[in-house]
């Protein structure tokens, strides 16, 4: 019987999820056995708190975590029926966070509304391997600003290679006036592969994959992952405050 495991990881510590000696999957194989499937093949630099892997072995999360390196945790498990495909999820929820340089919020929201729905997203995909359909459905894209940051939430059934990072770039570009509504409509109606750059990977995190499956949470493992990300956040916030103070000190010389 196959088993699903929810995993959280700091993507800045690994060279992607799979396909490289320094990727995450070799570590997961040592801890959980052969990986039969995965929820998302995240790029180098992309983090996750709700990615999923499937194996044939039943392993307690604490036992798996004892074999995993710093920055990755198994924190929940579920038994699933034979033939279960972790690529076929009800929905996937990603968050992209970017610095706010004064991008117009209304323009970004208009772009997000255009990009949501069912479309051919070939302009927003970087192909790898064999050709696959670039038609998919995005249920919602929400845009909000908080202080110096822009938060972009993407919820959809499935996303292709680099797709969210390219969509994020386009939405931010709309906020800067670089892309107009008709430019975005044109990219959807007349696909131009390679026309849209990718936003930096470090701004992206996979928050959840919904299968309608009830997972058993290992709370000690969950808390360890939480404490790690909180620790990373506080140190990053302190470093950001140093740079802000330095900039303000230099700006004062112009007064």
From Swiss-Prot:
Annotated transmembrane regions: none
Enzyme nomenclature, EC number: 5.4.99.12
Superkingdom assignment: Archaea
Active site feature: 43 (nucleophile)
One GO term (biological process): tRNA pseudouridine synthesis
Enzyme class: isomerase
Keyword Ion transport listed: no
Pfam families: PseudoU_synth_1
Record-listed substrate binding positions: 94
Molecular-function GO term, any one: RNA binding
Role of this protein: Formation of pseudouridine at positions 38, 39 and 40 in the anticodon stem and loop of transfer RNAs.
HAMAP family: TruA
Sequence similarity: Belongs to the tRNA pseudouridine synthase TruA family.
Protein known as: tRNA pseudouridine synthase A
């Amino acid at each position: 019987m196959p088993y699903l495991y929810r995993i959280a990881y700091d993507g800045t510590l690994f060279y992607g999820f799979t396909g490289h000696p320094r990727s995450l999957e070799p570590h997961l194989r040592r801890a959980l056995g052969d990986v039969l499937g995965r929820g998302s093949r995240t790029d180098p630099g992309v983090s996750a708190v709700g990615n999923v892997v499937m194996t044939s072995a039943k392993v307690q999360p604490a036992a798996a975590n004892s074999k995993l390196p710093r920055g990755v945790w198994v924190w929940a498990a579920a038994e699933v029926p034979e033939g279960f495909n972790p690529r076929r999820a009800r929905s996937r929820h990603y968050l992209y966070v970017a610095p706010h340089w004064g991008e117009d919020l209304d323009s970004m929201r208009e772009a997000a509304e255009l990009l949501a729905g069912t479309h051919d997203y070939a302009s927003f995909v970087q192909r790898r391997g064999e050709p696959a359909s670039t038609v998919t459905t995005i249920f919602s894209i929400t845009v909000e600003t908080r202080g110096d940051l822009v938060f972009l939430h993407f919820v959809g059934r499935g996303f292709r290679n680099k797709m969210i990072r390219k969509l994020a770039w386009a939405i931010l570009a709309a906020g800067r006036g670089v892309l107009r509504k008709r430019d975005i409509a044109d990219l959807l109606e007349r696909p131009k592969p390679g026309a849209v750059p990718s936003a930096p990977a470090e701004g992206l995190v996979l928050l959840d994959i919904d299968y309608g499956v009830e997972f058993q949470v290992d709370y000690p493992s969950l808390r360890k992952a939480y404490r790690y990300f909180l620790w990373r956040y506080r140190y990053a916030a302190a470093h950001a405050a140093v740079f802000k103070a330095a900039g303000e000190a230099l700006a004062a010389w112009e007064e």
